[in-house]
Every structure is written in C-alpha cells, then in structure tokens.
Amino acid sequence: MLEEYRKHVAERAAEGIAPKPLDANQMAALVELLKNPPAGEEEFLLDLLTNRVPPGVDEAAYVKAGFLAAIAKGEAKSPLLTPEKAIELLGTMQGGYNIHPLIDALDDAKLAPIAAKALSHTLLMFDNFYDVEEKAKAGNEYAKQVMQSWADAEWFLNRPALAEKLTVTVFKVTGETNTDDLSPAPDAWSRPDIPLHALAMLKNAREGIEPDQPGVVGPIKQIEALQQKGFPLAYVGDVVGTGSSRKSATNSVLWFMGDDIPHVPNKRGGGLCLGGKIAPIFFNTMEDAGALPIEVDVSNLNMGDVIDVYPYKGEVRNHETGELLATFELKTDVLIDEVRAGGRIPLIIGRGLTTKAREALGLPHSDVFRQAKDVAESDRGFSLAQKMVGRACGVKGIRPGAYCEPKMTSVGSQDTTGPMTRDELKDLACLGFSADLVMQSFCHTAAYPKPVDVNTHHTLPDFIMNRGGVSLRPGDGVIHSWLNRMLLPDTVGTGGDSHTRFPIGISFPAGSGLVAFAAATGVMPLDMPESVLVRFKGKMQPGITLRDLVHAIPLYAIKQGLLTVEKKGKKNIFSGRILEIEGLPDLKVEQAFELTDASAERSAAGCTIKLNKEPIIEYLNSNIVLLKWMIAEGYGDRRTLERRIQGMEKWLANPELLEADADAEYAAVIDIDLADIKEPILCAPNDPDDARPLSAVQGEKIDEVFIGSCMTNIGHFRAAGKLLDAHKGQLPTRLWVAPPTRMDAAQLTEEGYYSVFGKSGARIEIPGCSLCMGNQARVADGATVVSTSTRNFPNRLGTGANVFLASAELAAVAALIGKLPTPEEYQTYVAQVDKTAVDTYRYLNFNQLSQYTEKADGVIFQTAV
C-alpha cells in the first residue's frame, strides 16, 4: 500500500498537485500497517491517519472511526496509538461515524475529558444531541460540560475573530468572470478532485491573464509569482461568478486563495473576493465556504496591488501609502460571524446546536451571535414570491432583507455537480434526507461518458436512493424537465444547477454545499431578496415565440437603463433579486418554464410566474400518471414517489393558488406590450444580456445550429421537424437535435419526426443536455452558431465559437438557409408552422397516453395514505 501510495504522490507532485485523500481500501491497509508499523514509517503513517482521510460519513471515515473506536476500547492495539490519542483523533472527524465512540467515551473516566473537549467543538450532532443530553440528565459530569460548552458557544468563541485589517495581493480579472471561466465545462469530470480541477481555472487566455498552457492549464505561474509578495491573494473582478451554480468555481478560487482546513484533505476555506457585482449563487457559495465576498467598486484596484481591506470600517486602502481606494458596506454583518465559524453552513448548524443546548438547560437565548438587521415594518402587501417563501416559513409573507430558513419541498441534483454534492453530504454526516423530495439526474454526462462518469452512473443512484431520494437513469433526460413534473404548487426548493427555476412555486438554485445542506436538513438559509416585476400585456404577434418574450426582458431593461451590456460599472436590476412575471396566466406549465428558466441568465436569485389554476391542474393530473409509471418501471425511492403523488392529489382536491397583493412593492417594474414585439429577438455573441432584434443581425452566416436544452419542449421539435420536412436537399449547416427527455424522444419517434431529422442529416443526441454545457460534444472551433440553449458565454459551446441564442423556430430557419434570415423571410417560413399550430404545440399529457396509463393503473401504493 505504501509503495502504491508513494507512486501516486510522485505522479501528482509532477502535476504540481496534492495527492488524493485515502479511500476505504487504502484506509483498511493503513489500519494493518498501524497495528504493525514498519521501522521508520511511524510518523508518515500517523500523518496519513490524521490528515489524509475525508471526514463525515465517507467510506474511508467509516474504517478510520471503527479502528480508532476499537483502539479506545482496547479491542485493537497499535504501538503508535493510545486510547487517549484515538479519542483525540476521533474528535477531528467533524461528525458521522465518530460520534458514538466519543459519546461512549464520556463514561470512561480516563477518556471522558478528551471526549468532552472533542464533542464541545463538534457541530454535526443532529439527533445524537439527545444521547449527550440523556447522559447529562443522568448525572454524567462530562456530558454536562459538553452541554454547557455548546450553550456557551465555545465552538465559535474559541475560533479567531475576523481581523480588523486584511492585507492581500490583488489578483484581478477584468470584465466578467463567469463560473465557466473558473470551472470549465470540459473539465467537469475532475470537479470532485479539487486540486486537479483547479489547474483548469482561467485556462483560456484573456486580458491580463497568462495561462501556463492555453486551453489546458491556467495561470499557475502568474499566481505563484504574486504569492511571492508574501500576502494571501484576493480574487478581484468587475463582474464575478455569473452563470452556472457550480461550487467547483468557488473550490478552484479558494484552492489558490484560501486556507487549509485542519484534518480535511484537499479542501480549503476562507479567502477574500472583491467584485463590482458578484452573482448571487456564487456569493452564497463563497459564504458557505467561509470566504468573505464583498461588492465594491474595483476600478482603482489593479493586478498585483497590495491592499488593506478593513471589513468593519468598510474601506479598501493602498497598503504602502494608506490612500483610500474604495468604500463598501457588507451585505450583512452576519458575514463576520460566518467567516469566524468557517462558513455560513457551520454557523447555522452551530447556532442551532447552541440554541438547542440553551433550551435544554433552561437558559435564555444566546447573545453571542450577530443578528440579521430587523426589517422595517410595512403595511404594504406581499408579492407572490414573498408569500410563497412566507408559507414555507409558516408566516403570511417575508419582507425583502429578512433572514429566513424556508422549508425545502423539492431539491434537485445533476451529475456534474452531484459527485460534489455527495462529498458535501458525507461531510455533513447525512445518512437520510429531511427534504420531502430529492432528485438526482444524469443528463450532463450520459451521452459521451468518461470512465469517471460511468463510475458516477453506477454509484450515485444507490447513494441517493439509500437516503430516500429519487434517482433518474442515464438517458432519461434533463434534470429540470423531470423535476418540474415532481413539483407541488406554491412550494419552495433548490437545486445544484443554476437553471433550477420552478414554473410552479419558487426555487433558489445553489452550489453543491448548500444543496447538500437543504437535502440533509430540509431547510435552506435565505436573505430574502427584493423583487422585480415584469408585466406583459396585449396579444402576441404572428411568428413571435415565447423565446422572443424571454429575450424581450433584457431588451426592455436595457431600454429603461436598468441593464447594461458593458461589464465595467455593470448595471443589472435583476442581479440577486427575484424576477416575478405576470400577464401570461394561460400558458401551459411547460411554456411557463421557458420564462422562469431564463431568469438564470438575468443573474436573478429566483423567479415566479403567475398562472391560472387550469394549466396547473392539467399538469399535475399528467404528472401523477408519470410518477406512477416510474414506480411501475422500478424507479426509487418508491416511498418518496408515493408521498409526492399523494401531495399532488391533496392539492388537486382543493386547488388554491397564492396571489400577489395589489399593493406589493417592487424594486422596479418593467412593462412589455406584446403588440410592440413584431420580430424575433436574439441574444448576440457572446452575452445573454446582449438582446437584439433580428433585423439588427440579419444575414449573419451560420455554420451550426443546436435545437435542445431545458429551454425546449416537444412543441419546438415538432415545429423544427415541419420546417425541415418541407425542405428539399442537403442542409447548408450542421444541425444538432437533442430532445429534453426520453418521453419526448419516444413521442417524436412515434409521430415520425425522428425520420425527418434523420433524412435532413441532423445529428440526433440522446435525451439530455448535449451541447448546452459544452462539457462533452462541442461545436467546431470558431463556428458561428444559432442555439436554443440557455447561455452563450465565450467558449461555452465551442472554443472561439460565436453563439446567437434564439427560438427553435428561428434556429430551424437558420439551419435551412445557412444564415440569419430577414424578418420577412422568417415570417414566410413560420407561416407554414402556424397553419398547424394546434397540432404542433401539443404537450405531453401522460394521463392521455396509453403506454403510461396502462402501467400507472397497475400501481398499488405500499405506504399508508
């Protein structure tokens, strides 16, 4: 084992990275070596045991905790470990498999003082809290000490407070840094391996950034040169962290700019991030990791500057001269406590533990922690989002700025973030989900899996289902197209994908750490954002699609001066706020998702859309049959699926919807008259904010076209199919087609559309994300593309690609003629589709499809109603 491990260490060192943590097999071999250590290896073996094993409920942690417990009880022997040392090491494992041995040790006079000290600083107690409380009530003095320590918040007060002054060297990335820059999609397979994945950060050359190997390895030498100044680095940018929810972006930044976490291999916390604008999901993920994110004017900060940041005073000064460079205000003073606690999640768990201990001891509420500012009382009404979050908190509504912890009814996880979520769940010692429904998909890696992806496909489903979650299968399709069909109206949820944007209810997408917390605990921390209201009125004009309305939102915001495309001094009214949409109440739920989904591109924290009851009733009746069909097909966890079906049936028995109050307050209101939108609206390369009418970009030569992603539904493929079917001869473009789900693919096949796609020469992908994320298949380098996908960041769909975002209808026309049409040409083509619109835009009602109803009708529930 040692020979193999040292070989691995040498291989990793050649890449300039730390070795991987020990796995369960290596840990088992280490146990045998510790029992009979080879001469001269003693110190090395102890270091491996102490510092190179993941904490929580990792498989290796299970072996480690079992061995240390046996040493503590005298059931195993090692010349390197005393029972006292074993208890001390158990105390470094954070939670999970180490807890019971520590609690047992409270009854051993020799070990109890060490165990009590360890438990005093262990936060992940969950129901084991009551075991300690029981011992304390029975008179165990050490258990009493632990309870008092928790009540006094010693776990928090013994950690260093945030310093008055932070001296750092500026690592500045000008313009916008999106999460694809920090965690490139083609490298998604390596995300759980933080040191390896971090090598790809900023691997594409850009102003001021010098990658070691462009397109492969980021600016490691540049970072190391700045570190020679002797101070930690701070990540600084005009706009930071837009785009996907990937926690790997934060992991990579902190790998170079954060601090080691004692006894936790290959993970870092802390760090400082300064941005003119910091995207909300990235901001939250930084908070969760114990970093200090600050929104501040960075125009006076340059690469390599040494600066002093005063977090309490809200000042940034030149380190040498003391010149004032910028002022700021922390988003919330609670950030100061979050940094001290090692992150927002440890703070929440720790505060909860302190509160529980004080209640058990009959003590008043602790005054140790900073509280979120009280929100001013208001006699105004609540918006729809404020009412939804309020209901999830057991109150009528939640005002903007208020801190709350809403109940998580639905949680989603996908396969490029799922392995990180699994690691976070292990770190949280989670063996069962508290959220009502947790769903895992395999949509980003199913098409062209690497061996590491195949391993994920084999291992992640059982991990999720064993904890009571629902696991999809590779080839089933896109996370959102499935999760939407499992939702309950007016409820709150989250997901480890920035496009988790519920069309019924509301969701606040998050990084893997927060998603794991929400799944494990059933709640999620939220500083309630303000809302921006977008009101549509009037009638849609001929040839105009919902995708055009999606793009009308940034276009009209630009017209009102509420959004700028320029990154320096970026204005974005939607950033960090909730987008609330009204005026389209009769949309089908599948259509409504097109609008809520795109709130991700606005950097909005969440989105609601006001719908009438009828489309929601239709949707739920269909979804009940789909979920029963899943049970018949052997999907699990069965109890969770049955419980969700019962939840839908309960709502249908009394279908009431929350509504915004007429006098609700909004940060801004954008009115859009549908009569004014007479031509398609696209987003130009390479920025989803850069919305333009078709006439402004007409005639642009197009090389490739992609019709797919979570922004599409079956109607889009029928429309494209009808346009393609009328075309004779070869397409002048390369066309990619990827239906969102296996159900869409089956129905399109049955209706003959797959034959049409095949004849046209289209490349038909399996249901899933396909090109959208750019982590597997990609368009040709430098291609000009029309895509129905979610976002068009630089290099996302292909290296150097120029991507226009557009409707499926416009994309199909571009595929046919090899260029962007004029508005008149476009109208000529889509008139063909409009003639059969009733047939084209039919949606999947599973309760009307015999292949689903026949199986669903045979399902007998196994859980009590």
Curated annotation (Swiss-Prot):
A Pfam family hit: Aconitase_B_N
This enzyme's EC code(s): 4.2.1.3, 4.2.1.99
Cited InterPro entries: Acnase/IPM_dHydase_lsu_aba_1/3, Acoase/IPM_deHydtase_lsu_aba, Aconitase/3IPM_dehydase_swvl, Aconitase/IPM_isomerase, Aconitase_4Fe-4S_BS, Aconitase_4Fe-4S_dom, Aconitase_B, Aconitase_B_HEAT-like_dom
GO cellular component terms attached to this protein's record: cytosol
Residues that hold [4Fe-4S] cluster according to the record: 710, 769, 772
Any one GO MF annotation of this record: 2-methylisocitrate dehydratase activity
Chain ranges passing through the membrane: none
Catalytic activity: citrate = D-threo-isocitrate; (2S,3R)-3-hydroxybutane-1,2,3-tricarboxylate = 2-methyl-cis-aconitate + H2O
UniProt keyword 4Fe-4S, yes or no: yes
pH dependence statement: Optimum pH is 7.4.
Stored SUPFAM superfamilies: Aconitase B, N-terminal domain, Aconitase iron-sulfur domain, LeuD/IlvD-like
Observed effect of gene inactivation: Cells lacking this gene are more sensitive to peroxide stress. The acnAB double mutant does not grow on unsupplemented glucose minimal medium and does not respond under aerobic conditions to glutamate. The acnAB double mutant retains a low but significant aconitase activity.
Key word Membrane present: no
Cofactor(s), names only, from the UniProt record: [4Fe-4S] cluster
Class of this enzyme: lyase
Pathway info: Organic acid metabolism; propanoate degradation; Carbohydrate metabolism; tricarboxylic acid cycle; isocitrate from oxaloacetate: step 2/2
Cofactor binding notes: Binds 1 [4Fe-4S] cluster per subunit.
Biological process annotations from GO: glyoxylate cycle; propionate catabolic process, 2-methylcitrate cycle; regulation of translation; tricarboxylic acid cycle
Note: AcnB is sensitive to oxidation in vivo.
Free-text function comment from the UniProt entry: Involved in the catabolism of short chain fatty acids (SCFA) via the tricarboxylic acid (TCA)(acetyl degradation route) and the 2-methylcitrate cycle I (propionate degradation route). Catalyzes the reversible isomerization of citrate to isocitrate via cis-aconitate. Also catalyzes the hydration of 2-methyl-cis-aconitate to yield (2R,3S)-2-methylisocitrate. The apo form of AcnB functions as a RNA-binding regulatory protein.
Subunit structure: Monomer. AcnB can also form a homodimer. The monomer-homodimer transition is dependent on iron availability and the carboxymethylation of C-273 inhibits the dimer formation.
UniProt similarity note: Belongs to the aconitase/IPM isomerase family.
Protein name: Aconitate hydratase B
Organism: Escherichia coli (strain K12)
Lineage: Bacteria, Pseudomonadati, Pseudomonadota, Gammaproteobacteria, Enterobacterales
Gene: acnB
